Amino acid sequence: MQLADKTALVTGGSDGIGLSIARELKAAGTSVIVVGRNAGRLASAQAEGFEALEADLSAEAGCTALLQALGTRTIDIVINNAGMGSDFDVNAPVDLAATDRCIFLNLNAPIRLIVGLLDALKARPTAMIVNVTSGLAIAPNAGSPVYCATKAGLRSFTLALRAQLKGTSIHVLEALPPVVETRMTADNNHRKLPAAECARQVVAAMAAGRDEANVGMTRLL
């Protein structure tokens, strides 16, 4: 896909993988709207030249507010990157409210945004949906069962979505990062891929029109 002169929406775009993807796209000539929920990080993104929208996508109200804020804006690329982890051990007290937020942000929000923006994307000569899943969608970790389940669910949704949109102007890409150096993985002692390198590989896959971006070590899965 030609990335220059396109407009991309990047959720979770004020930090980590999302911000790094936004920077790569900007360098390729794409106008980028970053979405996040931290006002300070959004202000920093604005200082880099990005348009910023504040929305908490871990609840239905935040998804609705974002779609309303976008209105009839022209969007060529939607990158569903926002995500969160969830501590979950059935042998210990479980915070079900936090579990629900994780499921909504990681799985429900991408589906809602895709449904809300689908007609606008179909109207574009070329468009793209990028769903950021994880290597854990293929090889789950017993310590993060809810997170792994949401990413596996998004992977399955992405595969079906690609089949349903065959023959339209919309290309569907799944990005599967390994453990990446972000705030979310600060306590993870595994070897981490720099967010900038992850973003470089994802954007290269977008430009090449690939169906999957198996980033870093996920190529081995």
Predicted regions: what they are:
Residues 114, 150:
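Active-site helix of classical SDR
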Residues 47-61:
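Rossmann-fold cofactor-recognition segment
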Residues 167, 174, 182, 186-221:
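C-terminal helical subdomain
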Residues 7, 14-15:
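Conserved glycine-rich cofactor-binding loop
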Residues 64, 68, 85-100, 143:
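Conserved mid-core segment of classical short-chain dehydrogenase/reductases
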Residues 141-145, 188:
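Active-site loop immediately N-terminal to the catalytic Tyr-X3-Lys motif
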Residues 134:
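Residue(s) in the substrate-gating loop at a strand-loop-helix junction
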